Amino acid sequence: MQKSLVIVESPAKAKTINQYLGSEYIVKSSIGHIRDLTKGKLYNKEKNKKFLNENFIEKTNENKILIKQMGIDPYQNWKFEYHILPGKEKIISELKYIANQVKHIYLATDLDREGEAIAWHLKEVIGGDSSKFSRVVFNEITQHSIQKAFKNVGHINMNRVHAQQARRFMDRIVGYMISPLLWKKIARGLSAGRVQSVAVRIIADRESIIKNFVPEEYWKLDVSLISQDKKKINMDVTHYNNKKFRPINENEVSFAVEKIQKSSCIVKNYEEKISYLKAPAPFITSTLQQSASLRLGFSVKKTMFLAQKLYEEGYITYMRTDSNYLSEYAIKKVRKYIKSNYGSNYLPKEPNIYSNEKHSQEAHEAIRPSDIKIKNIDSDHLNSSAKKLYELIWNQFLASQMKSVKYKSITVTVLADMFKLQKSERIVMFQGWNKVLIEEKNVFSQFPILQTGSQLFINKVTPSQKFTKPPPRFSEASLVRELEKKGIGRPSTYSAITSKIQDRGYVKIKKNKFYAEKMGEILTIRLKKSFSNLIDYNFTAHMEKKLDQVAENKVTWRYLLDDFFKKFSEQLEQAKKSPEEGGMELNNIVPTSLNCPICCKKMGIKTAITGVFLSCLGYNNTDNKKRCKKTINLITLNDFNKEQDNQKKISLQLIQKCDICNMYMDSYFINEKLKLHICANNPSCSGYKFEKGVFKSPIYLSKTIQCEKCYNNMKLKIGPFGKFFTCINKICKNTRKILPNGEISDPKLEPIPFPELLCKQSDAWFVLREGISGIFFAANTFPKSRETRSPFVEELVRFQHLLPEKIYYLSSAPVIDNYGNKTIVCFDKKKKTHYIASKKDGKFTGWSAVFIDQKWCVINK
């Protein structure tokens, strides 16, 4: 009997689907995308000038080169050129071979637009009769869904493919056509993105608000009252003379205290009412990312990686969705579960229905467990983090179909002369969905029952000084919420956005909060001026709606791209002009009064992708022999000063203001005796101030580090991933990281090759390396192969002649535990020491051994 071929994206997904299909199906994986637009290095006119004649570097020829590099031609009706991704040739050959042997091909890639595009690419590359191909779509990898999907096969939706393709082309145009301009005008290594630049703007705008914020003083009054039955009630003063009470200084609050203390306090109103809090909606991608960040501390990237694993293993529905829709089948199952396990009291008469958000795309289901009966996952294929995420999804889905929480809300209003005092509390009358989401349960103290007109007696009046606070910095969770609120990007892109803007060096995360880097601020200002549409919130959201219309066949993809490119190219040509002609401003160096310690010329303030630093003006000398390359690193105060949460302290800090434009100034350390304050508008504003004194500086500024390899000194440098020390010996090239706490990392081992130990996932072999989590084996072909694992002790014993003195003691550890299980090397991050543990069937046994006083001591749990 001739078989059929089923193609999916991932091996894990293929393995799970294979369990539900019969022997007449061959399930294979494409391992993601198989082809993409042609990609070449961006053309740099200045760099390539010497290789080209004058005619060749004319504008038209520059465009030809750029078009070839982009793989798309906006001037020729959006012609495009795709190429097979490196490493996918073998996969494609296998798929083509099998495709020729089977009677039918089912393209079972993911149900979103990206999955639709992958299905189309597979069909194009495999080729053959179109009638031989069918599109299969399912929301969850369960036997019920798979069988249902294969009974209702369809065809590739080219409208959705065009929507994905239009997005891809637009992003390629923006990235490839703006980046060379940014290199020329601002700094090398910069890039712009249709969505990423808007995300950077959100963070940079918030950064500006925070830095410009001036705390304002205000006071609150807390009045402790005693009822006639001797019970205490604490109330807030909310109004004075029917106006909101908000004293701004101590004199005003002292007047209020005196007045209230002399007044009679009479209960004006005591109100009780019943209120209900509806169950939260099941997760969509953005709310899952936010909840996982807030409740589990997961990054957006980690959340999506784990959700992908859960989906591929068949535990949850598809994880990229912006729809709250739940199928009748899922609702029926969960209602039955609630009734059986919690009783009819917790089950609403009708299912809870949640309307989709205004930005929702196709009617996918919300994220939910595939089987509500599976409360906890018992699988060796998934780690504890994946299991925690599943539990979060399970609880949210179950709670979404339970009854509302019932509250009794109590509000008390008291009059004291012209002052109004108020207090509101609520008591849980019925837990409802809080029975599942225990962490959201509200616990409140109860008021004494008060009669209207009854008198209360003043026990104490307590004034407290407060200061207004700036809006908080964005966390990953709140940034995703802001992107969703503004309609920027899609659920499937949030993870890539938050990762990319960090990788580019435009923002950084510190203590789970986003900070805009100086280059991110400069880039935002330049793009706002030269590409106002591109970086506008409404324009970006509008473009998402237009892409939706392409997917719905309401707008043609070429028309959308033509309309976008016409306006974009006009702005691009204007931005290329000189600043005097209205073009994009340059990232000019700002001269200072500080002399270069080498050539005595002046040092200037310069901003690059690595940060702000001082550079000798002698670097611009046309004579290379006379060019001075001296630079001085500037360390921001935020890098080692803890944030002051006490707003009173903030208000008393001396805020440096620019003498030229009155803008706030960023402060930097040069050394223990010199600070530099730079106008936040730099380089557009040349304002700066030096401050002399004796300052407490970071540990690494006052230390002289010696290279452990060649014994030369090491100097401080700043790279894309932070500060580090590098050996002054150019041949040595040794580096040492600076840890987040300001300490310098210990020297790491040189990689040790183990060609005898072969990898399982590729043809590579292992190399012993040392990282922040101790020693580990990694593939020698990294990053092509990212396979890693812990070393077995028996392997270290076998090759102990290769081990350096630092870890030689590990070869004397027990090779097996008391039960014959092999032991592996582990690392204790708190103690920063290695220890030995054993595993059985992929799980730790509880047996371990530590090295104390030159011997191994066994610990059994």
From Swiss-Prot:
Domain annotation Toprim: ranges: 3-141
Stored InterPro entries: TOP1_Znf, Topo_IA, Topo_IA_2, Topo_IA_AS, Topo_IA_cen, Topo_IA_cen_sub1, Topo_IA_cen_sub2, Topo_IA_cen_sub3
Superkingdom, natural source: Bacteria
Zinc fingers (C4-type) by residue: 596-628, 658-685, 707-732
Entry EC number(s): 5.6.2.1
Keyword field: DNA-binding, Isomerase, Magnesium, Metal-binding, Repeat, Topoisomerase, Zinc, Zinc-finger
UniProt entry tagged with the keyword Transmembrane helix: no
Residues that bind Mg(2+): E9, D110
Pfam families in the cross-refs: Topoisom_bac, Toprim, Zn_ribbon_bTOP1, Zn_Ribbon_Topo
Cofactor: Mg(2+)
Boundaries of every Topo IA-type catalytic domain copy: 157-572
Record-annotated active site: Y318 (o-(5'-phospho-dna)-tyrosine intermediate)
Region (Interaction with DNA): 191-196
Catalysed reactions, semicolon-separated: ATP-independent breakage of single-stranded DNA, followed by passage and rejoining
Coiled coil regions, renumbered to chain: none
A single MF term (Gene Ontology): DNA binding
Site for Interaction with DNA, residues: H33, R167, R168, D171, Y176, W183, R320, R504
CDD domains: TOP1Ac, TOPRIM_TopoIA_TopoI
Assembly information from the UniProt record: Monomer.
HAMAP family with a match to the protein in the record: Topoisom_1_prok
Family that this chain belongs to: Belongs to the type IA topoisomerase family.
Described purpose of this protein according to its UniProt entry: Releases the supercoiling and torsional tension of DNA, which is introduced during the DNA replication and transcription, by transiently cleaving and rejoining one strand of the DNA duplex. Introduces a single-strand break via transesterification at a target site in duplex DNA. The scissile phosphodiester is attacked by the catalytic tyrosine of the enzyme, resulting in the formation of a DNA-(5'-phosphotyrosyl)-enzyme intermediate and the expulsion of a 3'-OH DNA strand. The free DNA strand then undergoes passage around the unbroken strand, thus removing DNA supercoils.
Name recorded for this polypeptide: DNA topoisomerase 1
Lineage: Bacteria, Pseudomonadati, Pseudomonadota, Gammaproteobacteria, Enterobacterales
